[in-house]
Protein backbone atom coordinates (compact mmCIF):
# COMPACT_ATOMS: atom_id res chain seq x y z
CA UNK A 1 0.00 0.00 0.00
CA UNK A 2 1.36 3.40 -0.98
CA UNK A 3 2.03 5.82 1.85
CA UNK A 4 3.62 8.76 0.03
CA UNK A 5 3.70 9.95 -3.58
CA UNK A 6 6.06 12.65 -4.85
CA UNK A 7 5.44 13.93 -8.37
CA UNK A 8 7.70 16.38 -10.26
CA UNK A 9 8.99 18.04 -7.09
CA UNK A 10 11.01 21.18 -7.81
CA UNK A 11 12.48 23.71 -5.39
CA UNK A 12 15.05 26.26 -6.52
CA UNK A 13 17.03 29.01 -4.82
CA UNK A 14 18.58 32.22 -6.10
CA UNK A 15 21.93 30.50 -6.54
CA UNK A 16 20.25 27.81 -8.65
CA UNK A 17 20.75 24.95 -6.20
CA UNK A 18 17.79 22.82 -5.12
CA UNK A 19 15.92 19.91 -6.67
CA UNK A 20 14.29 19.48 -10.07
CA UNK A 21 11.42 17.23 -11.14
CA UNK A 22 11.89 14.53 -8.49
CA UNK A 23 9.29 11.75 -8.63
CA UNK A 24 9.16 8.71 -6.36
CA UNK A 25 6.90 6.89 -3.93
CA UNK A 26 7.16 5.13 -0.58
CA UNK A 27 5.15 2.06 0.33
CA UNK A 28 3.92 1.02 3.76
CA UNK A 29 6.58 -1.00 5.58
CA UNK A 30 9.39 0.20 3.30
CA UNK A 31 12.76 1.80 4.04
CA UNK A 32 13.79 4.13 1.24
CA UNK A 33 17.22 5.77 1.26
CA UNK A 34 17.97 9.08 -0.44
CA UNK A 35 21.63 8.85 -1.34
CA UNK A 36 23.84 11.58 -2.71
CA UNK A 37 26.93 13.70 -2.02
CA UNK A 38 26.85 16.95 -0.07
CA UNK A 39 24.90 19.59 -1.97
CA UNK A 40 22.90 17.05 -3.97
CA UNK A 41 19.55 18.31 -2.65
CA UNK A 42 18.86 15.79 0.10
CA UNK A 43 18.06 18.32 2.83
CA UNK A 44 15.91 20.39 0.47
CA UNK A 45 13.92 17.27 -0.38
CA UNK A 46 13.37 16.45 3.29
CA UNK A 47 12.25 19.99 4.11
CA UNK A 48 9.70 19.85 1.31
CA UNK A 49 8.42 16.44 2.44
CA UNK A 50 7.93 17.66 6.00
CA UNK A 51 6.25 20.91 4.99
CA UNK A 52 9.10 23.16 6.12
CA UNK A 53 9.58 24.33 2.52
CA UNK A 54 6.85 24.94 -0.04
CA UNK A 55 7.79 23.43 -3.42
CA UNK A 56 7.95 25.72 -6.44
CA UNK A 57 6.36 22.98 -8.52
CA UNK A 58 5.05 19.47 -8.09
CA UNK A 59 2.92 17.56 -5.63
CA UNK A 60 3.59 15.69 -2.40
CA UNK A 61 0.81 13.52 -1.02
CA UNK A 62 0.99 11.49 2.19
CA UNK A 63 -2.03 9.22 2.47
CA UNK A 64 -3.67 11.48 -0.10
CA UNK A 65 -3.05 14.80 1.69
CA UNK A 66 -0.28 17.44 1.47
CA UNK A 67 2.45 17.72 4.16
CA UNK A 68 0.87 20.87 5.64
CA UNK A 69 -2.33 19.05 6.57
CA UNK A 70 -2.60 18.82 10.37
CA UNK A 71 -3.50 15.12 10.29
CA UNK A 72 -0.49 14.39 8.08
CA UNK A 73 1.82 16.27 10.44
CA UNK A 74 0.77 13.94 13.25
CA UNK A 75 1.79 10.93 11.15
CA UNK A 76 5.19 12.20 10.01
CA UNK A 77 8.18 12.41 12.36
CA UNK A 78 11.34 14.27 11.37
CA UNK A 79 14.59 13.06 12.92
CA UNK A 80 17.02 15.93 12.14
CA UNK A 81 20.76 15.56 11.68
CA UNK A 82 21.28 17.49 14.93
CA UNK A 83 19.13 16.28 17.87
CA UNK A 84 17.53 19.42 19.30
CA UNK A 85 16.63 18.78 22.95
CA UNK A 86 15.97 21.00 25.94
CA UNK A 87 19.21 20.53 27.96
CA UNK A 88 17.51 21.31 31.29
CA UNK A 89 14.84 18.62 30.81
CA UNK A 90 15.34 14.96 31.57
CA UNK A 91 14.94 12.43 28.78
CA UNK A 92 11.55 11.39 30.16
CA UNK A 93 10.37 15.00 30.51
CA UNK A 94 11.31 15.79 26.91
CA UNK A 95 9.38 12.79 25.58
CA UNK A 96 6.44 13.57 27.86
CA UNK A 97 6.37 17.14 26.51
CA UNK A 98 6.14 15.78 22.96
CA UNK A 99 3.49 13.23 23.90
CA UNK A 100 1.24 15.87 25.45
CA UNK A 101 1.68 18.07 22.38
CA UNK A 102 0.43 15.38 20.02
CA UNK A 103 -2.07 13.71 22.34
CA UNK A 104 -3.50 16.39 24.67
CA UNK A 105 -5.84 15.03 27.29
CA UNK A 106 -4.50 11.47 27.12
CA UNK A 107 -4.24 9.89 30.55
CA UNK A 108 -1.66 7.25 29.63
CA UNK A 109 1.18 9.68 28.83
CA UNK A 110 3.58 8.35 31.47
CA UNK A 111 2.98 4.79 30.31
CA UNK A 112 3.59 5.83 26.70
CA UNK A 113 6.84 7.53 27.70
CA UNK A 114 8.06 4.47 29.60
CA UNK A 115 7.32 2.10 26.71
CA UNK A 116 9.01 4.46 24.24
CA UNK A 117 12.14 4.68 26.39
CA UNK A 118 12.16 0.91 26.72
CA UNK A 119 11.82 0.46 22.96
CA UNK A 120 14.92 2.57 22.32
CA UNK A 121 16.81 0.90 25.20
CA UNK A 122 17.10 4.14 27.16
CA UNK A 123 14.95 3.48 30.22
CA UNK A 124 18.02 3.70 32.51
CA UNK A 125 18.59 7.28 31.27
CA UNK A 126 14.99 8.39 31.87
CA UNK A 127 15.90 10.82 34.66
CA UNK A 128 19.18 12.08 33.18
CA UNK A 129 19.31 15.63 31.80
CA UNK A 130 19.30 15.78 28.01
CA UNK A 131 22.33 18.06 28.11
CA UNK A 132 24.34 15.24 29.70
CA UNK A 133 23.51 12.60 27.10
CA UNK A 134 25.79 11.43 24.30
CA UNK A 135 24.89 12.15 20.67
CA UNK A 136 23.63 8.61 20.16
CA UNK A 137 21.52 8.79 23.32
CA UNK A 138 20.08 12.16 22.26
CA UNK A 139 19.09 10.65 18.93
CA UNK A 140 17.28 7.85 20.76
CA UNK A 141 15.36 10.42 22.82
CA UNK A 142 14.22 12.01 19.54
CA UNK A 143 13.21 8.58 18.24
CA UNK A 144 11.27 7.91 21.44
CA UNK A 145 9.47 11.20 20.90
CA UNK A 146 8.48 10.00 17.44
CA UNK A 147 7.19 6.76 18.95
CA UNK A 148 4.85 8.53 21.37
CA UNK A 149 3.72 10.67 18.45
CA UNK A 150 2.42 7.44 16.82
CA UNK A 151 4.19 8.33 13.57
CA UNK A 152 3.69 6.24 10.44
CA UNK A 153 6.54 7.80 8.45
CA UNK A 154 9.97 8.43 9.95
CA UNK A 155 12.09 10.90 7.97
CA UNK A 156 15.73 10.86 9.03
CA UNK A 157 18.32 13.41 7.89
CA UNK A 158 21.92 12.06 7.96
CA UNK A 159 21.17 9.86 11.01
CA UNK A 160 24.53 8.06 11.14
CA UNK A 161 26.80 11.11 11.31
CA UNK A 162 28.72 11.11 14.59
CA UNK A 163 27.53 7.65 15.64
CA UNK A 164 29.86 4.80 16.52
CA UNK A 165 29.51 1.40 14.83
CA UNK A 166 27.30 -0.21 17.55
CA UNK A 167 24.94 2.79 17.45
CA UNK A 168 24.68 2.58 13.66
CA UNK A 169 23.89 -1.13 13.88
CA UNK A 170 21.28 -0.49 16.56
CA UNK A 171 19.63 2.19 14.40
CA UNK A 172 19.56 -0.11 11.38
CA UNK A 173 17.91 -2.89 13.39
CA UNK A 174 15.42 -0.47 14.98
CA UNK A 175 14.31 0.87 11.59
CA UNK A 176 13.76 -2.66 10.31
CA UNK A 177 11.67 -3.45 13.38
CA UNK A 178 9.50 -0.36 12.87
CA UNK A 179 8.86 -1.19 9.22
CA UNK A 180 7.98 -4.76 10.19
CA UNK A 181 5.27 -3.12 12.32
CA UNK A 182 3.86 -1.29 9.28
CA UNK A 183 5.69 2.03 9.54
CA UNK A 184 7.87 3.45 6.76
CA UNK A 185 11.20 5.27 6.77
CA UNK A 186 12.84 7.76 4.42
CA UNK A 187 16.53 8.12 5.18
CA UNK A 188 18.70 10.86 3.70
CA UNK A 189 22.35 9.86 3.89
CA UNK A 190 25.72 9.81 2.17
CA UNK A 191 26.65 6.50 3.84
CA UNK A 192 26.48 3.79 1.16
CA UNK A 193 27.36 1.18 3.75
CA UNK A 194 24.30 2.05 5.89
CA UNK A 195 22.05 2.06 2.81
CA UNK A 196 23.05 -1.45 1.75
CA UNK A 197 22.70 -2.73 5.32
CA UNK A 198 19.34 -1.10 6.03
CA UNK A 199 17.27 0.04 3.04
CA UNK A 200 14.87 -1.73 0.71
CA UNK A 201 15.26 0.86 -2.03
CA UNK A 202 17.79 3.53 -2.86
CA UNK A 203 17.12 6.80 -4.68
CA UNK A 204 20.27 8.37 -6.09
CA UNK A 205 20.33 12.13 -6.69
CA UNK A 206 23.02 14.45 -7.98
CA UNK A 207 22.78 18.22 -8.48
CA UNK A 208 19.11 18.03 -7.48
CA UNK A 209 18.19 15.54 -10.20
CA UNK A 210 17.10 11.91 -9.96
CA UNK A 211 19.75 9.53 -11.25
CA UNK A 212 18.34 6.14 -10.26
CA UNK A 213 15.57 4.55 -8.20
CA UNK A 214 16.48 0.93 -7.53
CA UNK A 215 15.83 -1.85 -5.07
CA UNK A 216 19.01 -2.46 -3.09
CA UNK A 217 19.66 -5.96 -4.57
CA UNK A 218 19.43 -4.42 -8.07
CA UNK A 219 21.84 -1.69 -7.04
CA UNK A 220 24.32 -4.23 -5.65
CA UNK A 221 24.24 -6.15 -8.93
CA UNK A 222 25.16 -3.08 -10.98
CA UNK A 223 28.89 -2.75 -10.45
CA UNK A 224 29.22 0.31 -12.66
CA UNK A 225 26.61 2.22 -10.67
CA UNK A 226 28.30 1.24 -7.40
CA UNK A 227 31.62 2.55 -8.68
CA UNK A 228 30.02 5.79 -9.86
CA UNK A 229 28.25 6.34 -6.53
CA UNK A 230 31.42 5.68 -4.54
CA UNK A 231 33.23 8.18 -6.76
CA UNK A 232 30.51 10.80 -6.23
CA UNK A 233 30.38 10.32 -2.50
CA UNK A 234 34.14 10.44 -2.21
CA UNK A 235 34.19 7.76 0.46
CA UNK A 236 32.63 4.41 1.31
CA UNK A 237 30.92 5.57 4.51
CA UNK A 238 30.61 8.55 6.85
CA UNK A 239 32.87 7.13 9.56
UniProtKB/Swiss-Prot annotation:
Reactions catalysed, as given in the entry: sulfate(out) + ATP + H2O = sulfate(in) + ADP + phosphate + H(+); thiosulfate(out) + ATP + H2O = thiosulfate(in) + ADP + phosphate + H(+)
Keyword Translocase attributed: yes
EC number: 7.3.2.3
Biological processes, Gene Ontology terms: bacteriocin biosynthetic process
Keywords: Antibiotic biosynthesis, ATP-binding, Bacteriocin biosynthesis, Cell membrane, Membrane, Nucleotide-binding, Translocase, Transport
GO cellular component terms, A-Z: plasma membrane
Factors inducing expression: By Spo0A and PhoP, during nutrient starvation, especially phosphate starvation. Repressed by AbrB during normal growth when nutrients are plentiful, in association with the transcriptional repressor Abh.
Protein's membrane topology: Peripheral membrane protein
One Pfam family this sequence matches: ABC_tran
CDD domains per the UniProt record, alphabetical: ABC_DR_subfamily_A
Entry function: Probably part of the ABC transporter SkfEF involved in the export of the bacteriocin SKF. Probably responsible for energy coupling to the transport system.
Name assigned to this protein: SkfA peptide export ATP-binding protein SkfE
Gene that this sequence comes from: skfE
